[in-house]
Amino acid sequence: MKKLILVLALSLGLGSAFAQKIKETEVPAAVKDGFKKQYPNAKVSEWEKEGANFEAEFKQNKVETSVVIDANGAILETEVEIAVKELPAAVSEYISKNYAGYKVDEATKITDSKGTVTYEAEVEKGKEEFDLIFDSNGSFIKKAS
């Protein structure tokens, strides 16, 4: 029983180490400045700390958007929620073939600082849920929890 509690405690601790909600007052000025420079009219609904980086969640033109920003204020990637039908056809084909019975719950277009685009499809079946990552052409890259 003690081992189970230890495993659960470690799992929860590690999970929160990847992305932790923080108050705006905990966000360094350089990070906030970098965000405001790129999105001067946006209002951040939530800040998270992801390792050494920060994530700002906000709505842009009524669309859920988030950006990952480094400690110096440079935007590393932008994630924009898209309609499932906006995923490349190859993504839908891959999911139908390899994950029959699963439903795409959410879709995201991710653009890194170099302009490289990837897509993330959050799929679920019952209580099972995970993300599938694809390149800009819809070719499968990896499965993420």
Which residue ranges define each predicted feature?
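Bacterial Sec-dependent N-terminal signal peptides
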Residues: 1-22
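Mature soluble domains of exported/periplasmic/lumenal proteins and thiol-rich metal-chelating peptides
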Residues: 20-145
